[in-house]
Amino acid sequence: VGALRDFPGCAVMSMVRPRGGDFLYSTDDLAVMEADVRHAKAAGADGVVFGLLEAGGEVDLASCTHLARLCAELQLDFTFHRAVDASCDPVQAVVSLARAGFRRVLTSGGHARAVDGAGTIRAMVDAVKGTGLRVMVGSGVRPDNVVRLLRETGAHEAHGSCRTEVQSAFRHRPAVSFSASGSDYTRHETDTEQVRALVAAAAAIPRPSSGKA
């Protein structure tokens, strides 16, 4: 986070997620998340990204509100991440998040790729008109589909990894592996040209307002 602060004009949002797997968190998990929010602030982050659900798939409003209030006290922006795509009803989830004071949610419309969830994303956008909650479309967003996605969904923002696979220059191949998944000898890096193309494509179309009165 500190290194990223050296790039002017680039807002830094830190992911707050204590473990992999689902988004049903224990009291201990929540305590770790609270500490991570404070650490993100101390490191210079502009905001944090988190998401918590109940066992039945509803938004965990009590825990989310607790973290949101902490963020407000620390003057940190906060976004609800793609946990919304694992919720039992993404449309109702964003309505709940808007009422809880969230100003941004990242979603693929409950599908692996945003292009497949475009209809649900549109319903989510329509459901929170006038609340100030901004819907950010993400997952599989590329320079060649970002315009269509923003137009079809009415989403206010887009998120893309713009990543490319890079081969390692490490020639020795030991018999052990240290990767949880995939190969030890490939990694993903951000592709600068993809980023430029994505930004240019998105900037070329009129932006919808947040709908806040």
Question: Residue locations for each model-derived region?
Answer:
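Active-site beta->alpha loop and helix N-cap motifs at the rims of alpha/beta catalytic domains
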Residues: 1-62
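Alpha-helix-loop-beta-strand connector modules within alpha/beta enzyme cores
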Residues: 1-20, 59-82, 118-143, 180-208
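Short, flexible active-site-adjacent loop segments at beta-strand->alpha-helix junctions, enriched
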Residues: 16-20, 54, 84, 111, ...
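Catalytic cores of alpha/beta
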Residues: 21-39, 85-100, 124-131, 137, ...
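Generic structural signal for helix capping and beta-alpha/helix-loop junctions
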Residues: 22, 57, 87-88, 114-115, ...
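Glycine-rich phosphate-binding active-site loops on the catalytic face of alpha/beta enzymes
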Residues: 39-55, 102-115, 153-176, 185
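Catalytic beta/alpha-barrel core
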Residues: 46-61, 77-88, 93-94, 103-115, ...
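Long hydrophobic alpha-helical segments typical of transmembrane helices together
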Residues: 149-213
